[in-house]
Amino acid sequence: MLFLLSPAKSLDFEKPAAPVPHTQPLFIPQAAELIDILKKKSPRQIASLMSLSDTLAGLNVARYQAWVPKFTAKNAKQAVLAFNGDVYEGLDAKSLPVDDLKWLQDHVCILSGLYGVLRPLDYMQPYRLEMGTKLANPQGKDLYQFWGAQISDYLNIRLHKNAAPVVVNLASQEYFRAVDRKALQARVLECVFQEYRGGQYKIISFYAKRARGLMARFAAEHRLSKPKQLEGFDAEGYAFDAAASEPDRLVFRRQQPLS
C-alpha cells in the first residue's frame, strides 16, 4: 500500500534538520521550471495570484529568488520534518524512531504543487505553491495541466511490484486531483474521519487533517500492508464504523476528541 498526504502551508525551517537520513527530490527539473516562472513575478503579482498578504507575498518572493537546484543541509530539510500543519502535528515525525521514518519513506508520498511528489525524507527548500494555484505555464493554465500524468506515472512505478496495488488517499481533494485516476493502475481507498456534533457525525476540517497524520503514523508504527488492517486504527478515540463505510471508503468516528 502507498499512502498519499497533502503538504502544509506552515513550515519549520527554524529548527535544524534532525540527524536522520535524507534523499534528493525526484522532480527537480520540473520544480526549477516552475521556480523560473515564479521568479519573474513581483510581490504584488504573487499576492494576487495566491491571495496572500503583502508580508507573506514578500517572504515567498524571497524564497523563490533564493531557491537553487542543489539541495543541501544548509538550504533544505527533510519534507516530513519541514511541514508543520495539522496533518504533520498528527504524524509527529520528529518523535518517530529512524526505522519508522524509513518505513514512511517507502510507503508515503507527499503531493506538492512545486515538487510534484516528495518522499518523507526528501530534502525540500521552503516554498509556497498550492496545487490549486492558477499559475500559467508552458503546459497549460494551471498546475494540474503542468503535472499532467507525471504523478500517476510515478505512483504506478512505485506500485508495480504489488500484486494488488492499493493507494490510501489521505490527501485533500485539491491535491488528489493532481493524480490522473484514469492512468493510475491501483485501487484507491479513501479514509473519512468524523466527529459527533449536534446529534450527527460530520467532518470537521481541523480534526480531519490531524487524523490523516495520525493514520499515517499508525501505519508506520504497525507496518500496515493490507487494507483490512486500516480498520484497526484507534488513535485518539477514533473507531472504524463498518455500517457507515463502503468497500473503498472507510469511515472512522468518535464521540469527542480526547483531551
From Swiss-Prot:
Pfam families documented for this protein: H2O2_YaaD
Any one Gene Ontology BP term: response to hydroperoxide
One GO CC annotation: cytosol
HAMAP family per the UniProt record, alphabetical: UPF0246
Family according to the record: Belongs to the UPF0246 family.
Protein name stated in the entry: UPF0246 protein Rfer_2372
The organism's taxonomic lineage, starting at the top: Bacteria, Pseudomonadati, Pseudomonadota, Betaproteobacteria, Burkholderiales
